[in-house]
């Protein structure tokens, strides 16, 4: 491209684009953001915009497309969603007041994790940028929501733990570097999280520069002041993240006032499969909140509370005292109905303190934001009063952390108009009486406008022109309009300004003088109001940390009040929490399913587990009878209790659980070349290698993805391993392998349960009741009948079932198959196959090794 032939504006565009090659450049030209050349082609295709052209000095016109500046957020959001980084290049001076090319600068780079515009954010979700790094012996992770200023950092020991943290926080973007050990697992992270990933230069993560950045940002003398003195990996991740944010925001990060350094062991660990299978924040079927646990429990009244509710459900506590403090707070709120209702009414009037503070710190808050902040602050005294009367140490603590913020309230109340516009550059923001100089200017312009408004009547009377009128437009300013039929009556002091088809427009020296006074005064008023507003905003910025502290406390009050509200409405009870190993639930219910039962009542069930005599519950019964629901509901009850919520049952005792694992259902991962069975075995290996004696494990139909004997072998060995003294994790194991039920008499800690079914006239009725003992029937044909399978097929299936059960028919086998080896697999006599299975150390076996072992077992079976 011959740059010397380009127009000055296009040279400016290309020079800017050269600095932001990896971004779509939105270049401000008047009332539009324009894109040129390749960017224009890309954007016109992605957003279905018209592709035009612009003369640029070259022989061919430059491809061009544009979007209105006032609607840019909508288009930027769509581009970011499609995986593009967007650089916004703004006009830095008034085009009408400068000579030559207008000065332009990139004022912000927008990426998935750095969005600050409220119109592009979901109010009930955090928008986290995550930063990860490591050296193979451990990893650092930091994450921040730039729109709220919330910032966190931690260290983890291995990649599995890092993946769990990433899933838990659900970031919108991840940054790392090629020099990190994380880079070797980048494909695994991408597949596991499906989050946009940005690789940065290694210099971002250098310990010295990262530490220096943190010390400057948080104004501390050493890392001890922010809790990172012995966490260098977390320090590097956090420093790199803040550097990246500074680079994209192009301004100081005033909303990031503190960093919360946490230990991952302080909360229950939930992996991706568990969050998905228990439908904690969204449903498996259509990925919506309705139908999930969050959909039932989230009756919060603020956006801050709703975001925190999601965090609490993904990170239940695993220490007795903090859990009890939350439960005591919920109890106090539940018992005092009047206070609870008053608190909820206060919260309904509270806007998003966090994001309002973020907008003030970033300089993007407008007059509407200020009045929203003032109105939110106005209810804090009543909120504090209601909290002070409740018997709860946690609520007392939160009440003390809510600052009245009176100075901010008074500052806004005195200065900002009640009904101010969204824009801050066109006046109408500052209250009368706040500035004498501003009021004086407004008075002078008022007098001039009154003179102008009375001019048409006085001129009609003076000239005798009955249809004379005074008007205004942006191009010609004020004018006096006279129709053609009255030209002969026009006075000599009228100066022609514009000719129309049927009229002439004039100006007089007096009108011109008043016009100058009005327009100059308007510009001065707008400028003065803008400067006063910015001054007020800067003054409030000094209170950002106080606002954020109040936001954190109000959000917690909102979640606790929501827990109390839902518990009262649904008849939940306060669980007992201790450090023992017992989980006991009397008449437990599934909190979500019971909400969707239109007719009838949800069938409640009991649960009792401990590590000594009932660590393994083997659950048999037909499909659709309720095995999975029973297991899920008990896992959810544990999760709810440790999150601090009351639970759906008549009584409940829970010995703290450190992790919940679920292996429920499976499907092929075709993109990764993995079969259903491989996915199932990978998940099982992960659980067996990660569980502790304080874990709760939910296993549904282990081994069904392969042949009967292979599957039974794996299920059998898994039960034995989980009941071994080495682990003894509390486990619920649903299976159709009825052969496993004999283990109740052989291994201490195994208890058989089954789902009760009633048979009437060849039909079955699912009672959904869990009872002691085992069942030897799966009722598969009955379930097929309920599903609408053709009668002819069902009759044939019933005949075949009778033959198989009587032993009159045997599966077709080759002459070379040695059935005795399979039939004696679990006999009291030793067999090579059983020895092989027993020799496998599942704690040390990787998924790939497990697959090879399974292949060897299969070869033995087929000999």
Model-derived features: positions:
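Conserved phosphate-binding elements of NTP-dependent enzyme cores
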Residues: 2-3, 11-15, 22, 537, ...
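ATPase nucleotide-binding head domains, primarily ABC-like/P-loop NTPase cores
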Residues: 37-40, 231, 301-302, 306, ...
């Amino acid at each position: 491209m011959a740059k010397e032939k380009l127009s000055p504006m296009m040279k400016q565009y290309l020079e800017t684009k050269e600095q932001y090659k990896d971004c779509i450049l939105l270049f401000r030209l008047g009332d539009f953001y324009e894109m040129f050349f390749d960017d224009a082609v890309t954007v016109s295709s992605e957003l279905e915009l018209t592709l035009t052209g612009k003369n640029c000095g070259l022989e061919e016109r430059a491809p061009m497309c544009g979007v209105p500046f006032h609607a840019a957020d909508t288009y930027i959001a769509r581009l970011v969603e499609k995986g593009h980084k967007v650089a916004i290049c703004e006009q830095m001076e008034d085009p009408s007041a400068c000579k030559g090319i207008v000065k332009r600068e990139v004022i912000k780079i927008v990426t998935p994790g750095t969005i600050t515009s409220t119109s592009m954010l979901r109010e009930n979700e955090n928008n986290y940028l995550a930063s990860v790094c490591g050296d193979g012996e451990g990893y650092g992770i930091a994450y921040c929501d730039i729109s709220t200023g919330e910032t966190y950092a931690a260290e983890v020991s291995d990649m599995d733990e890092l993946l769990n943290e990433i899933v838990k926080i659900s970031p919108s973007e991840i940054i790392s570097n090629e020099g990190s050990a994380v880079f070797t697992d980048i494909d695994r992270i991408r597949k596991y999280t499906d989050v946009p990933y940005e690789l940065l230069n290694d210099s971002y993560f250098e310990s010295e520069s990262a530490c220096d950045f943190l010390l400057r940002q948080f104004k501390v003398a050493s890392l001890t002041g922010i809790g990172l003195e012995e966490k260098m990996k977390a320090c590097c991740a956090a420093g790199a993240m803040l550097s990246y944010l500074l680079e994209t925001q192009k301004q100081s990060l005033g909303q990031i006032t503190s960093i919360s350094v946490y230990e991952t062991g302080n909360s229950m660990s939930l992996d991706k499969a568990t969050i998905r299978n228990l439908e904690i924040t969204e449903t498996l079927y259509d990925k919506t909140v309705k139908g999930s646990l969050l959909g039932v429990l989230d009756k919060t009244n603020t956006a801050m509370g709703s975001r925190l509710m999601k965090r609490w459900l993904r990170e239940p506590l695993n220490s007795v005292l903090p859990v009890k403090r939350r439960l005591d707070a919920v109890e106090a709120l539940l018992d005092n109905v009047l206070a609870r209702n008053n608190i909820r009414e206060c919260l309904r009037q509270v806007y998003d303190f966090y994001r309002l503070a973020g907008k003030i710190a970033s300089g993007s808050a407008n007059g509407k934001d200020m009045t929203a902040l003032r109105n939110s602050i106005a209810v804090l005294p009543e909120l504090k009063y209601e909290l002070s009367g409740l018997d709860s140490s946690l609520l007392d603590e939160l009440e003390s952390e809510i600052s009245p913020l009176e100075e901010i309230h008074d500052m806004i109340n005195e200065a900002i108009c009640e009904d101010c516009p969204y824009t801050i550059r066109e006046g109408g923001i500052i209250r009368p009486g706040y500035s004498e100089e501003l009021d004086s200017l407004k008075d002078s312009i008022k007098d001039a406008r009154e003179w102008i408004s009375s001019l048409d009547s006085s001129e009609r009377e003076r000239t005798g022109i009955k249809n004379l009128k005074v008007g205004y437009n942006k191009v010609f300013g004020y004018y006096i309009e006279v129709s053609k039929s009255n030209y002969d009556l026009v006075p000599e002091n009228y100066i022609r300004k514009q000719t129309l088809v049927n009229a002439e427009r004039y100006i007089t020296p007096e009108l011109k003088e008043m016009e100058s006074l009005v327009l100059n005064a308007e510009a001065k008023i707008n400028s003065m109001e803008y400067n006063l507003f910015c001054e007020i905003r800067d003054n409030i910025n000094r209170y950002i940390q106080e606002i954020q502290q109040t936001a954190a406390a109000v959000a917690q009050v909102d979640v606790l009040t929501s827990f109390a509200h839902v518990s009262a409405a649904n008849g939940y009870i306060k669980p007992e929490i201790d450090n023992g190993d017992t989980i006991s639930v009397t008449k437990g219910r599934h909190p979500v399913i019971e909400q969707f039962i239109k007719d009838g009542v949800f069938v409640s069930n009991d649960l009792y587990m401990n590590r000594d005599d009932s660590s393994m519950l083997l659950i048999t019964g037909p499909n659709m009878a309720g095995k999975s629901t029973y297991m899920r509901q008990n896992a959810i009850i544990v999760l709810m209790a440790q999150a601090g919520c009351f639970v759906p049952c008549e009584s409940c005792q829970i010995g703290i659980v450190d992790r919940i694992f679920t292996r429920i259902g499976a499907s092929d991962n075709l993109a990764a070349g993995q079969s259903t069975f491989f996915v199932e075995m990978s998940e099982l290996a992960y659980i067996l290698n990660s569980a502790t004696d304080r874990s709760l494990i939910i296993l549904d139909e282990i081994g069904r993805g392969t042949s009967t004997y292979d599957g039974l072998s794996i299920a059998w060995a898994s039960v034995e391993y989980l009941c071994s003294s080495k682990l003894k994790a509390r486990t619920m194991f649903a299976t159709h392998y009825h052969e496993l039920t004999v283990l109740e008499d052989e291994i201490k800690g195994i208890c058989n349960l089954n789902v009760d079914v009633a048979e009437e006239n060849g039909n079955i009725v699912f009672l959904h009741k869990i009872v002691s003992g085992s069942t030897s029937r799966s009722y598969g044909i009955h379930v097929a009948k309920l599903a609408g399978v053709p009668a002819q097929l069902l009759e044939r299936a019933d005949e075949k079932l009778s033959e198989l059960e009587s032993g009159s028919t045997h599966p077709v086998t080759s002459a070379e198959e040695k059935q005795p080896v399979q039939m004696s697999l679990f006999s009291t006599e030793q067999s090579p196959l059983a020895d092989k299975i027993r020799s496998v150390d599942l704690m040390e076996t990787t998924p790939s090794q497990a697959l090879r072992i399974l292949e060897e077992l299969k070869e033995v079976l087929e000999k």
